Amino acid sequence: MAGKLFGTDGVRGVANFYPMTADFATKLGMACGAELCQVYRKVAIARDTRISGEMLQSALAAGFLSAGVDVVLLGVLPTPALTSVTADLDVDMSVMITASHNPYYDNGIKLITSNGDKFDDDTTSKLEVLVAENKFDLSSEKLGRIIYNNEALVMYLEKAKSFISSSKPLAGTRIVLDCANGSFSGIMPQVFKDLGAGVISLENEPDGYNINRDCGSQHPEKLYETVKGAHAGIGIAVDGDGDRLLVCDDEGHKIPAEQLIAFLAKYLKDEGKYRGNAVVSTIISNTAMERYIRNLGFEYYSTKVGERAIIAKMQELGCSVGGEESGHMVVADYSKSGDGMVNALLVCLAWAASGKKMSEIFPLFKFDPYVFVSVPLKDRAMVAEAAASEKVKAAVSEAENIMSGKGRVVLHPSGTEPKLRVWVSGSDETLVKKSADMIIAEINKLQEE
């Protein structure tokens, strides 16, 4: 097994091609069963709506069962729902089968601890070794059983709405919801209707193939047009597994995630519900956000890119809110991980309480000039090569010199796709663009060599 399979969000690939094959999934189930399931001898498995989910679920379940571990099948469930209820299921771990915002033909496997957190790199590296060695101590007697659980969604919804004190707090609002034909389809529209909102639902009929197809948080064009055409007050989109959130105002303009993070932090603080005094984001968040957060009286901390790093820092600081520009936002008192629906509910509650239009509330602050581009490369090996390239490093140094030390350059390999992300910010928009173009050109040259 060549290379590191686990990225920042589990293992991903094209369904029925390595590593997203039934064979690999079965071996991974065996490895997890042998290494991680020693207390309850039980695991929970959920999946999103893509067509390959059932195949991978069956293969994973077979691996766990052969290792003597009982398998609790939860069916289709949003990722934040699984992280929310895992600790209440009396299992050693849970597994989410999803490729998040990717197209239907991709899929992935996320491993979740008994507390609803992600496993560390040491654990996933050990699992890779076990799968590669393929030497498992199996028995004809010690086999697991399948258990079907239809209560996980109900458990999640009870938690997800626990912070809502009145019965119809969204009465009189008109909201457009794009469910990305994913795991929140049929769930999120009903929750908002129950809270009094007038709801227009988009992309709410998954067929196994249409998940994230020209919809959801990564493709919100239809959302924007619908909000404007329907004279709605707000537009909300999630991705296929429900851990990302995108919001647009009543004029169909996207509200960047950094603005939403600051908005939620301020709302919870004003309501007297903020725990701690810090807000966490990443090294590629806009510098204007940091200034705004500090001006609100918070301390501001940045981490490397990725939800796991953000959550770890939030746990260390004991604070309520963290997130990143990708749309992953965590409100720790109400969710274990990025939860598109919970965060959308909080945004809507704050908006409804303000009595203002969303376009009157946002923007909270003006962004400093920046360029953020994900450069697609041949494979992950080329991503690593580009990140380590002396020529690319020289271009980064030259860019920093061009901006006279008043800018910031970050190169970050995607943890889920063969892309190298380039982020450049500074006070001079022309110099920022020139610097970014220079770095991107150097990266692209590597593909031509």
Regions inferred by a protein language model and the residue ranges of each:
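N-terminal small/polar loop signature for handling phosphorylated ligands or for N-terminal nucleophile
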Residues: A34, K42-D106, Q190-C248
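An N-terminal, well-structured beta->alpha segment
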Residues: M1-A62, S66-A67, M93, I146-I175, ...
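Phosphate-binding and adjacent anionic-ligand microenvironments
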Residues: E271-E449
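Glycine-rich phosphate-binding loop
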Residues: V91-D106, V227-D249, K254, F298-D339
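Short glycine-rich phosphate-binding loop at a beta-alpha junction
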Residues: R41-D48, R174-V176, N277-I283, R421-W423
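Gly/Ser/Thr-enriched, mixed-charge loops and adjacent short helices
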Residues: V14, N107-A230
